């Protein structure tokens, strides 16, 4: 009985270890993508935006250009994440012929009228969070709780649903983000297609 308990503890993984495995997973350093964003308002009216996104240095630098609809064409967003400094974020608004600087205090603002905030467009730094595996299930999913330490955030925590799909390869399937009162604020679902 003692041996069985020892082996079970030997193979148990901490929340921090799981977060580090996710952070180190294979991913492209530079990405160029053409995306469609569909916004649906409370009256179920839809607005479709088309955009190009280019990310470099593990998404620490990102540029987004909006192509459609015509009234949003030319709007662009630039993000440069910095270590030990506030991130640099700005939007070019061609209708006003000016830039809008996004300050740290504005990171919870909506991005282009969507449910995404500017904070959602930034990478999370492992050292800025405390991690706990709050449960696992029979389907092999881990539920990882990430709680911000002292950083300014619109969130009190995130709960991420993760699965090991191959030996040492973990994929995020879903994430719930909670506001400062611990109410569910956002649910993100990630779909993958093998090509």
Predicted regions and their residues:
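N-terminal export/membrane-targeting signals
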Residues: 1-6
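N-terminal mature ectodomain segment of secretory-pathway/periplasmic proteins
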Residues: 14-94
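Short, ordered beta-strand-loop transition motifs
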Residues: 55-60, 83, 133-141, 194-195
């Amino acid at each position: 009985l003692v041996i069985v308990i020892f082996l079970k503890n030997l193979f148990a993984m901490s929340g921090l270890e799981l977060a580090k495995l996710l952070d180190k997973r294979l991913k492209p350093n530079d990405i160029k993508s053409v995306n469609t964003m569909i916004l649906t308002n409370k009256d179920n009216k839809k607005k479709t935006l088309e955009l190009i996104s280019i990310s470099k240095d593990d998404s620490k630098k990102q540029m987004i250009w909006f192509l459609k609809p015509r009234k949003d064409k030319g709007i662009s967003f630039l993000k440069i994440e910095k270590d030990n400094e506030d991130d640099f974020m700005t939007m070019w608004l061609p209708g006003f012929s000016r830039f809008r600087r996004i300050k740290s205090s504005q990171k919870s603002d909506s991005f282009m009228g969507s449910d995404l905030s500017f904070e959602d467009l930034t990478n999370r730094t492992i050292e800025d969070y405390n991690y706990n595996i709050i449960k696992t299930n029979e389907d092999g999913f881990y539920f990882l709780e990430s709680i911000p330490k002292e950083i300014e955030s619109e969130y009190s925590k995130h709960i991420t649903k993760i699965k090991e799909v191959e030996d040492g390869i973990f994929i995020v399937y879903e994430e719930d983000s909670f506001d400062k009162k611990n109410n569910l604020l956002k649910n993100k679902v990630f779909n993958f297609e093998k090509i």
